Amino acid sequence: LHVLTDYLNQDSMKTASGEVRHVILTEEGFTAQSLTRGDVSDIQAAAFAYAYYLVDNNPYIDAFILNRQVDAVIEVEQSCSFGLWTVDMSSPNRVIAVMPKNIYNVFKYIDTNKSLKYTEFAKKIIGINKWSDVIPGFKLQE
């Protein structure tokens, strides 16, 4: 992500008034299902935490908007499970939230003083000891 914002920080990419162009990330998502590994909801939650912290520590990213609150039946049938909640698969024409996934509490607490508590598990999945190992200038107190 920093490669993109570093690129936009070049003089040739700046606005006419010399300002760095900012980025809005939309329709972002991480699946909790894998065709080869099955349920990867811990990886989904860890990926969101990592991505959120990267965005939060980059001054040129203005927004990070997730794809779905609740999984979509048609996407789950294709092993794409992007929501914070599972969906009732028996109601293909309606979106009925069934159960929160691991990502739900990470999402809920990521902007609070409980953030590090709810993302602690992710460091093992990512293979780090502390967030500042992979996020230069990490803002939260570790």
Please name every model-derived segment.
Residues 33-142:
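Aromatic-rich peripheral "rim/lid" segments of glycoside hydrolase catalytic domains that contact
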Residues 1-38, 86:
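Noncatalytic carbohydrate-binding groove/subsite architecture in carbohydrate-active enzymes
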